[in-house]
Every structure is written in structure tokens, then in C-alpha cells.
Design a protein with these regions (language model features):
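HIT superfamily nucleotide-processing domains
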Residues: 1-123
Length: 123
């Protein structure tokens, strides 16, 4: 399969992994919209949420909830956007959630390795 996220999940493309279990992998976005922008990727290749069973949806959102708490502790954002893209807005055809912290004060995007270390040091 020629899916970027499947290659990241299998490890043939490196990523900054924040969390991983049998169902999902959470990584830092390589082109972040904000400091702390992360992706929750189901390990099974799924293109649309309609393909997900209720248990998997609940697990993905449970992990997203835990990541939200971690992002708030590590980065102290003023809010968070949770996004799914479908159809024309879905660049990579592998279902995933974006967690994008938002800040009242404009911030420059800093090195994602620095952000990664901040997040990992909270655990």
C-alpha cells in the first residue's frame, strides 16, 4: 500500500511518536499549523470514519482526550481544535484526527523537536 501514514505506522518512515498502542499511533505533525499540532492515526488503514466500528471510534477519541490533557500541561494553550478532513480537504486518504492547540497571542512555529521534548517531559 502506498499510504504515507501506513508507512509511518509500520516504521518505514520515521516520526516523532508521542503515544502508541495496538489501535493507534499519535505523532507530531511534520507541517504543524501551531506549536503542538499532533495527529491521532488508527493503525488499520481506513479512509473514512464510516468504516470505523464504535469501539475503535471510542478508543481514538479517548486517546485524543488524553493527548489534549497532555498538550495543556506541556504547552498551556488557550484552546484546542479537533479536526477531521474528508473529501477534497483530505490530503492523505487515511482517516486521522488533528489536535491543534490555539493561542491568544500569536506564536511563531518553533522547532517541533523542542515541542516534542516539552510534551514528553510532562509524562
Amino acid at each position: 500500500m502506498d499510504c504515507l501514514f501506513c508507512k509511518i505506522i509500520e516504521g518505514s518512515i520515521p516520526s516523532r511518536t508521542l503515544y502508541e498502542d495496538d489501535i493507534v499511533k499519535v505523532i507530531m505533525d511534520v507541517n504543524p499549523n501551531a506549536n503542538g499540532h499532533v495527529l491521532v492515526l488508527p493503525k488499520k488503514h481506513i479512509t473514512d470514519f464510516e468504516e470505523l466500528d464504535g469501539e475503535t471510534i471510542a478508543h481514538i477519541h479517548g486517546v485524543a482526550k488524553d493527548m489534549k490533557k497532555l498538550l495543556y500541561k506541556a504547552l498551556n494553550p488557550d484552546g484546542l481544535v479537533l479536526v477531521n478532513n474528508y473529501g477534497i480537504t483530505q490530503v492523505i486518504k487515511h482517516y486521522h484526527l488533528h489536535l491543534i492547540p490555539v493561542y491568544k497571542k500569536k506564536q511563531e512555529i518553533i522547532d517541533r523537536n523542542v515541542i516534542y521534548e516539552k510534551i514528553m517531559n510532562v509524562k
